[in-house]
């Protein structure tokens, strides 16, 4: 009289694995498709936040072609002071980034103009400046003098590299002296400050440019805002140490969005050469 109900087992669909890095969350909360973000030069389409670039990415969007001459590619850091764990950290960062150090120097063209370029990479020990980074900046300036070329430096650094102690701090004087020789030769030096430009880098070559540009929202300064607040026991103004704040107070000549940065550099170089 009563039939037994039949039940069917519904097999759950196989869980689809989403590739890592396919989506990226911006600080504004927007979820961005990685390929769209890359096409937009790694600038958020919702809030215009400028994500940090690797040195290779920066070179690719700045130089006319990827066919450039890398300078001093064989220079690599060593653990000169026997700092605990430093050798292992260097090896790990070299493997992760594919770089020898936190900076790449090169000669290439921008808008057809030959230039010497130095690009720092904050993904390598926070772009900190040790002996090799300082040497690359100094040699790039000397290369520019020998070949009568303008120098463009993209800074992205947390400051001096503590694992190299006084040897790292010495790079501040060395790079400043090299930039001084470039200036004496009457050659153009454009400094581009990107997020972050802090510590010994900001206190040396980063602020010695004939023209100083910055990307929107970049953190720029010597000590971090938290350290300053704890020292002076006062609340800092909103936006303190951001690129726009520094422009308002005369420390930066212009804040230029990444999409317009290459054209701006081309105009600056062209005007300097025409003069």
UniProtKB/Swiss-Prot annotation:
Keywords: ATP-binding, Cytoplasm, Fatty acid biosynthesis, Fatty acid metabolism, Lipid biosynthesis, Lipid metabolism, Metal-binding, Nucleotide-binding, Transferase, Zinc, Zinc-finger. Its main location: cytoplasm. Zn(2+) binds at residues 26, 28, 44, 47. Residues 21-275 form the CoA carboxyltransferase N-terminal domain. Pfam families: Carboxyl_trans, Zn_ribbon_ACC. GO terms for biological process: fatty acid biosynthetic process; malonyl-CoA biosynthetic process. It catalyses: N(6)-carboxybiotinyl-L-lysyl-[protein] + acetyl-CoA = N(6)-biotinyl-L-lysyl-[protein] + malonyl-CoA. This is Acetyl-coenzyme A carboxylase carboxyl transferase subunit beta. It comes from Desulforudis audaxviator (strain MP104C). The gene is accD.
